[in-house]
């Protein structure tokens, strides 16, 4: 009876240790992500290229590293932005800043937000696209606001690493297989 009780306590300790180790890994990853977000000034410091609109500069599946500390984006700079109301990051190049956009002066003067200065308004386009991105922007939006819409500017990349993310989103059954394999590995790893 005593050996049975002792083995149950030992199993409970092992299970608790595994749960705590798993929680430690998750919390460490979360802290690293948040630390990277603070360091780069971007809410999403790492993104994956989801389409071929920026070829040949970036291919689908490239992993991009972002930084969002500069107050202005320059023409030719590659930025990542979110369309208002949608949570899909778009990677495109800045083709115009406000002073170069003609006929928009009236709209700029009507903006009540004092932080929206001409240098904060951008027009973007994918390198592999024929037209600019005005069709992609939210309804009634003719340009991007640097502070509101831009997630960050590209500062580096690793080719093809993001394909794992693309595969998992395009084939949902792969998530189940991956979780199953990880679960089996955790069960077999008991010491």
Curated annotation (Swiss-Prot):
Q: What domain of life does the UniProt record list for this protein's source? A: Eukaryota
Annotated signal sequence is: none
Instruction: Write down the EC number.
Output: 3.4.21.89
The record's catalysed reaction(s) read: Cleavage of hydrophobic, N-terminal signal or leader sequences from secreted and periplasmic proteins
Query: What does the entry's free-text domain comment contain?
Result: The C-terminal short (CTS) helix is essential for catalytic activity. It may be accommodated as a transmembrane helix in the thinned membrane environment of the complex, similarly to the signal peptide in the complex substrates.
Topology relative to the membrane:
Single-pass type II membrane protein
Protein name as catalogued: Signal peptidase complex catalytic subunit sec11
What GO biological process terms are annotated to this protein in UniProt? protein targeting to ER; signal peptide processing
Provide the active-site residues from the annotation: 53 (charge relay system), 92 (charge relay system), 133 (charge relay system)
What are the GO MF terms of this UniProt record? serine-type endopeptidase activity
Tell me, in a sentence or two, what this protein's role is.
Catalytic component of the signal peptidase complex (SPC) which catalyzes the cleavage of N-terminal signal sequences from nascent proteins as they are translocated into the lumen of the endoplasmic reticulum. Specifically cleaves N-terminal signal peptides that contain a hydrophobic alpha-helix (h-region) shorter than 18-20 amino acids.
Which residue ranges are assigned to the Lumenal compartment in the record's topology? 34-191
Please give an example of a GO cellular component term from this record: signal peptidase complex
Q: Which family does it belong to?
A: Belongs to the peptidase S26B family.
Alphabetized, the UniProt keywords read: Endoplasmic reticulum, Hydrolase, Membrane, Protease, Signal-anchor, Transmembrane, Transmembrane helix
Q: Does the keyword Calcium apply?
A: no
Q: Which ranges does the record list as Cytoplasmic topological domains?
A: 1-14
Record-annotated membrane-spanning stretches = 15-33
Name of the gene encoding the protein in the UniProt record: sec11
């Amino acid at each position: 009876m005593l050996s049975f009780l002792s083995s149950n306590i030992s199993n409970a300790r092992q299970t608790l240790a595994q749960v705590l180790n798993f929680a430690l890994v998750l919390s460490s990853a979360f802290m690293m992500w948040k630390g990277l977000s603070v360091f780069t000034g971007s809410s999403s410091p790492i993104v994956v290229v989801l389409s071929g609109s920026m070829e040949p500069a970036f291919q689908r599946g490239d992993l991009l590293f972002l930084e969002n500390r500069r107050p202005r984006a320059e023409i030719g700079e590659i930025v990542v932005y979110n369309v208002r109301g949608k949570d899909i990051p778009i990677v495109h190049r800045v083709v115009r800043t406000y002073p170069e956009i003609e006929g928009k002066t009236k709209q700029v003067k009507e903006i009540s937000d004092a932080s929206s200065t001409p240098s904060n308004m951008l027009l973007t386009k994918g390198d592999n696209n024929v037209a600019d991105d005005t069709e992609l922007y939210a309804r009634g939006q003719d340009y991007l606001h640097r502070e509101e819409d831009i997630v960050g500017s590209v500062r580096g990349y690793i080719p093809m690493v993001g394909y794992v993310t693309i595969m998992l989103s395009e084939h949902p059954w792969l998530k189940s297989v991956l979780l199953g394999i990880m679960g089996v590995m955790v069960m077999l790893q008991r010491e």
